[in-house]
C-alpha cells in the first residue's frame, strides 16, 4: 500500500498493476508493475531470499526495473539501453560460461497438471546430470544471481508478469537472454487479463539458454 500510495502521489496519471491492488487503469502509456514481496514463502519461513521488485512499462515494453534485497541491502537496477547495476556497479553475465561449469536454478510450484510436472521433472533430471549443481531460492534472487554471474541460468515454470518482466530487463541489460520454454521471446500486453497469465521462462547467457531449450524439447 505504501508503494502504491507513493506512486499515485508523484505519478497520478500512470497505470499500476500488482497482485495486491489489481489493475488501476488510467489509460496511460506508462504502467508500474509491483511485486512488494517476491519470495513470500521464504520470508514467512525466516529464509533471507526475498525482496521488492518494481518495473516501469512504456506501452507494452519494460523500460526500467529495480529490485531490492533488504536482508543483504543490495539494490539492482536496469534501464533499457543503459546497462544493469548492483549497488551502483555495473554487472554482466559471462557469455562464454557453459552449463557444465554452472550452478543452475530450477523452480517448479504445485499444479494439478501432472503431465506438466512430469515433463518438468524430466528436464530437471537432465539438468542435474549436465550442470555443475542445482540451486534454487524460488524467488527473484535466482534471476538476480544469473544477472551478476553467480548462477549460470534459471528455469522457472510458474511466474507472473510482476515476477519476471523487470528481471528479464535486468538480465537483458546484463548481456543475457530470457525466453519462454518454447524458445520464443516473451511479450506482454498490459491489461487486467495479464494478471492471470503464467510465464514459464528460461534465462541465462545465450549458450546456456539454447542448451536448456534442447534439453526441454
Predicted regions mapped to residue ranges:
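N-terminal subdomain of lithium-sensitive/metallo-dependent phosphomonoesterases centered on the IMPase/IPPase/PAP
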Residues: 1-37, 177, 185-186, 206-217
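Short hydrophobic/aromatic-rich beta-strand segments that constitute the beta-sheet cores
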Residues: 77, 84-87, 106, 153
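An extended, acidic
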Residues: 92-217
Amino acid at each position: 500500500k505504501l508503494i502504491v500510495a507513493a506512486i499515485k502521489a508523484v505519478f497520478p496519471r500512470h497505470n499500476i498493476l500488482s497482485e495486491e491492488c489489481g489493475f488501476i487503469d488510467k489509460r496511460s502509456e506508462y504502467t508500474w508493475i509491483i511485486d512488494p514481496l517476491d519470495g513470500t514463502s521464504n520470508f514467512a519461513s525466516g529464509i533471507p531470499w526475498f525482496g521488492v521488485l518494481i518495473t516501469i512499462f512504456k506501452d507494452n515494453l519494460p523500460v526500467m526495473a529495480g529490485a531490492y534485497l533488504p536482508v543483504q541491502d543490495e539494490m539492482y537496477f536496469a534501464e533499457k539501453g543503459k546497462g544493469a547495476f548492483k549497488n551502483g556497479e555495473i554487472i554482466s553475465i559471462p557469455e562464454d560460461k557453459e552449463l557444465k561449469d554452472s550452478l543452475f536454478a530450477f523452480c517448479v510450484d504445485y499444479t494439478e497438471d501432472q503431465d506438466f510436472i512430469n515433463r518438468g521433472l524430466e528436464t530437471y533430471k537432465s539438468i542435474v546430470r549436465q550442470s555443475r549443481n542445482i540451486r534454487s531460492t524460488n524467488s527473484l534472487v535466482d534471476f538476480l544471481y544469473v544477472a551478476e554471474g553467480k548462477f549460470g541460468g534459471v528455469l522457472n515454470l510458474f511466474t507472473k508478469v510482476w515476477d519476471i518482466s523487470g528481471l528479464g530487463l535486468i538480465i537483458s541489460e546484463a548481456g543475457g537472454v530470457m525466453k519462454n520454454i518454447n524458445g520464443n521471446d516473451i511479450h506482454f500486453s498490459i491489461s487486467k487479463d495479464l494478471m492471470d497469465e503464467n510465464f514459464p521462462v528460461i534465462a541465462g547467457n545465450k549458450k546456456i539458454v539454447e542448451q536448456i531449450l534442447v534439453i526441454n524439447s
